[in-house]
């Protein structure tokens, strides 16, 4: 059985856009939680959410590749860039070796809803656009990143609610340990928008501490009142 090592890591989240920013946020106790006014407009009981800045990919990817990326794919792309950079994995290595990709992703609701809205309003499926299908599939991250980074190894998406990313890392470990793969890009990414979590809000699953956004997520507190969606 092979030993398995982590050679690089990348993070793009509500508490930082890279490892250094996340480290500083952890040292300073920054939660990255805030209020999303759009959720209140949609009738949400709780507008609390992790505030994740959408990356500007215009200088990093051509329009065709950007057009196929859903929101969570953008986050995953940025994290992957950092991970490969730390691991010193360049394009030449990716082209010459069989590198796999396993990503946890639980939904891609926004592109689906946006496409359906167009069809209902315009009565014309052609107006949905060519990129919609690649954004809508639950495999949107692994499908897009495998093309962008020339990944030719194992390729599938794992969906297991909040544990999706952890499952992906565990599965990558097992595949490398058993000798079935030599190198795998793995992790998790999730969309952060009102469409994907409306049902949770309706169930009363979210914290209602809108007056204390930074202190709302307190899973081990005896006075906890719910979770906070984030990414």
Model-inferred region functions:
Residues 2, 95-97:
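Residue-level preference for short coil/turn positions at secondary-structure junctions
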Residues 5, 100-102, 182-185:
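Conserved beta-strand elements of the Class I
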Residues 38-89, 93, 103, 138-152:
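A glycine- and small-residue-enriched flexible loop/hinge segment at structural boundaries
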Residues 1-65:
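ACP-dependent fatty acid/polyketide chain-elongation machinery
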Residues 9, 104-106:
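Structured loops at beta-to-helix junctions and adjacent beta-edge loops in soluble globular domains
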Residues 17-20, 30-36, 85-95, 106-231:
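Acyl-thioester C-C bond-transforming condensing/cleaving domain
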